[in-house]
Curated annotation (Swiss-Prot):
Domain of life: Bacteria
Gene: cobQ
Keywords attached to this entry: Cobalamin biosynthesis, Glutamine amidotransferase
GATase cobBQ-type domain: residues covered: 251-438
Pathway(s) where this gene product acts: Cofactor biosynthesis; adenosylcobalamin biosynthesis
InterPro entries xref list: Class_I_gatase-like, CobQ/CobB/MinD/ParA_Nub-bd_dom, CobQ_GATase1, CobQ_N, CobQ_synth, GATase_3, P-loop_NTPase
Name the record gives this protein: Cobyric acid synthase
Active site: C333 (nucleophile), H430
Pfam families, per the entry: CbiA, GATase_3
One MF annotation (Gene Ontology) recorded for this entry: ABC-type vitamin B12 transporter activity
Functional summary from the UniProt entry: Catalyzes amidations at positions B, D, E, and G on adenosylcobyrinic A,C-diamide. NH(2) groups are provided by glutamine, and one molecule of ATP is hydrogenolyzed for each amidation.
Keyword Transferase among record annotations: no
Lineage: Bacteria, Pseudomonadati, Pseudomonadota, Alphaproteobacteria, Hyphomicrobiales
Length: 483
């Protein structure tokens, strides 16, 4: 079994995913064969792994940081929330059904075998495996049968480092409180802690570090400052969208309704990186900005439920007004399905609504079907005759007159639809804006001169900068010696 270290957090969104990605790049730069692993993830921001299954987008990024192909075994259990009470369950990349609250808690012990099998496969041939926990180990109400945090750490005998987020405040209480709450067996797995997202003079927190060590007996592995490189990396948790605020006005405003079950929102990251583009995330209760040149309807884990939510917010009427003003619309995956005249779900795959009128902006209809399409694809944009690389993760089959004007060509078949005037577009492809030449042509058609940024190179550069920041701020030798 490969050497391993596990990073658990005092809560969600403390920066574990990015931290592990950065440490993966640190280890790679030091010449180690390093691999990422996350036993259980809950996210609608999924990726298609290089071996053809679904994993969390964070593990895809971590594999990139390691310089290795991504694998379903890097995230053997993925939960994709689709209602307030239930999630789609993905095991080793494949759909295994729906998991609801208490039923999933009873199911978790059975999933440990799959988790350990995947952990062994990931570790085969590796020098080091960097493991990411989920949420917080202090959620002791979920401890029985745990596969995400201490349950896994004990079962696999992997030492744990706790990560605290000082930016949100209360980091001393979070770490000391976690120490207090953890059962003795779990507490014994913790070898130390580190502080993430510090702003200002780090020396001002010296007394804080000493206090945490005094209360817990845990050693400090350092304090990570607020690193600008993080903002240039894909985010996995939608909580980051909730904190988005408008900046200085740019040449093109791209408005994105924040649907309750928004998925694969990292489709927008290449647009956010363009200097002439401002991506505005529009929260429920707010109006679509009247100065938007483009509205993007993003992917969603539940198309019908989010279409109902879109109407409840009045965004359907605002979208029609946007089009009448001459604005453009792009629907991606579930957003593409919403743009049509009708969505039918006779088998109740998404819930109790079996048939619903769409937005009517494209002359298409969608029929929900049980078979799920999960694949990486190479395509050609038929709008700009430029190559595309992306992926599909969806259920449903779409047809109709506007499909005669497809968005892209994938092998021997067409994808998506475009309205007769070219201003309404839809596609099942995720990741289209990562294609630099397509993105530049797309923006130019909207009257904006795109930058010359190579998006993939910018992500690689951000990972390198992140690794440099971690090398400078953490006791890397001490951390890696834990394994």
């Amino acid at each position: 079994m490969a050497r391993a270290i596990m990073f658990q957090g005092t809560g969600s969104d403390v920066g574990k995913s990015v931290l592990v990605a950065g440490l993966c790049r640190v280890a790679r730069n030091r010449g180690l064969k390093v691999r990422p692993f996350k036993p259980q993830n809950m996210s609608n921001n999924a990726a298609v792994s290089d071996d053809g299954g679904e994993i969390g987008r964070a593990q895809w990024l971590q594999a990139l940081a390691c310089g290795v192909p991504s694998s379903v075994h890097m995230n053997p259990v993925l939960l994709k929330p689709q209602t307030d009470m239930g999630s789609q369950l993905i095991v080793q990349g494949q759909v295994r059904g729906e998991a609801r609250g208490r039923y999933y808690q009873e199911l978790k012990p059975q999933l440990m075998a799959a988790v350990m099998e995947s952990f062994a496969k990931v570790g085969d041939g590796a020098d080091l495996v960097l493991v990411e926990g989920a949420g917080s180990p202090a959620e002791i109400n979920l401890r029985a049968g745990d596969i995400a945090n201490m349950g896994f750490a004990i079962h696999a005998d992997v030492p744990v480092v706790l990560v605290g987020d000082i930016d949100r405040g209360g980091v001393i209480a979070s770490l000391v409180g976690t120490h207090t709450i953890l059962p003795q067996e779990d507490r014994a797995m913790v070898r130390g802690f580190l502080i993430n997202k510090f702003r200002g003079d780090i020396s001002l927190f010296d007394d804080g570090l000493a206090a945490i060590t005094r209360f817990t007996g845990w050693r400090s592995f350092g304090v990570v400052p607020w690193l600008k490189a993080v903002s240039r990396l894909p985010a996995e948790d939608s909580v980051v969208l909730e904190r988005a605020v408008r900046g200085d006005k740019k040449a093109l405003i791209v408005a994105v309704p924040m649907l309750p079950r928004i998925a694969n929102f990292d489709d927008l990251d290449p647009l956010k990186a363009e200097p002439a583009v401002e991506v505005v995330m529009v929260p429920p209760g707010s109006s679509l900005p009247a100065d938007a040149g483009l509205v993007v309807l993003p992917g969603t884990k539940s198309t019908i439920a989010d279409l109902l939510a879109l109407r409840e917010n009045g965004w359907d009427r605002e979208l029609v007004a946007h089009v009448k003003r001459g604005g453009h619309v792009l629907g991606i995956c579930g957003g593409f399905q919403m743009l049509g005249r009708r969505i039918s779900d006779p088998a109740g795959i998404e819930g109790n609504v079996r048939d619903i009128e769409g937005l009517g902006l494209l002359d298409i209809e969608t029929m929900m079907e049980p078979e799920k399409v999960v694949r990486n694809v190479e395509a050609v944009s038929l709008l700009h005759d430029e190559p595309l690389e992306g992926y599909e993760i969806h259920i449903g089959r779409t047809s109709g007159p506007d499909m005669a004007r497809p968005f892209a060509r994938i092998g021997d078949h067409d994808d998506g639809a475009v309205s007769p005037d070219g201003r309404i577009m839809g596609t099942y492809l995720h990741g289209v804006f990562s294609a630099d030449r397509f993105r530049h042509h797309f923006l130019r058609a909207l009257g904006v001169e795109g930058g010359q940024m190579n998006y993939r190179e910018s992500v690689e550069e951000a990972l390198d900068e992140l690794a440099e920041g971690l090398e400078a701020s953490l006791d890397i030798d001490g951390l890696f010696a834990l394994a």
